[in-house]
């Protein structure tokens, strides 16, 4: 397609186990996506749509959580790692296992190893992005990822926003900003 495409979906998702006591095994999940526009405006539009949908659904307070998969890409850029080594690093990041990350990154340049080991601590409010700029090695890809997150956060000031720079859910699918919105108790 040469045009922008907007998609939405809604339906029940069956879980083998409930997330918590007295919770349903078949929660309602809905989502929306925009294809065909690579700019931040599309990310902003879809986040605003998701936020508005949660507010209309009267789910209570809304929290936005964001990351950018290019942060890990920027750290690993230029490194020759096997698929197994990359998978092990991703697993350790997802578990926020700094001890395992330290072992896995021993052979990498210090700036890369230190950056990867810093990611599990880089979560919280927008100040995390300033901390990331101080402790992660600068590169065009890294700088762009952090600036994009800041740009979005500035335009979404009316919603509680958190960042988890080690969050790799959907890493293989996403190419930039990844976000999740939570209503009520999240």
Region spans (language model):
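Acidic, His- and aromatic-enriched active-site or binding-groove loops in soluble protein domains
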Residues: 80-104
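Short, solvent-exposed helix-helix connector turns and helix-capping sites enriched
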Residues: 68, 96-97, 125
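Short glycine/threonine-rich loop-to-helix capping motif typified by GTGT followed
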Residues: 73-83, 173-179
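Hydrophobic mid-domain F-helix/FG-region of cytochrome P450s
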Residues: 49-56, 70-80
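A generic structural motif
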Residues: 64-66, 90-92, 164
């Amino acid at each position: 397609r040469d045009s922008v495409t907007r998609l939405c979906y809604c339906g029940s998702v069956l879980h083998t186990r409930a997330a918590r006591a007295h919770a349903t095994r078949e929660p309602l999940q809905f989502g929306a996506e925009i294809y065909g526009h690579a700019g931040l405006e599309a990310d902003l539009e879809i986040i605003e749509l998701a936020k508005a949908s949660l507010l209309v659904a009267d789910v209570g307070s809304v929290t936005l959580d964001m990351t950018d998969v290019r942060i890990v890409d920027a750290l690993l850029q230029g490194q020759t790692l096997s698929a197994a080594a990359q998978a092990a690093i991703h697993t350790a990041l997802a578990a926020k296992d700094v001890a395992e990350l330290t072992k896995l990154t021993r052979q990498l340049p210090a700036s890369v190893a230190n950056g990867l080991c810093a990611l599990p601590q880089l979560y919280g409010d927008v100040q995390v992005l300033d901390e990331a700029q101080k402790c992660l090695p600068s590169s065009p890809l890294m700088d762009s990822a952090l600036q994009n997150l800041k740009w979005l956060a500035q335009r979404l000031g009316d919603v509680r926003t958190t960042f988890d720079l080690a969050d790799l859910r959907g890493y293989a699918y996403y190419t930039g900003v990844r976000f999740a919105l939570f209503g009520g108790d999240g």
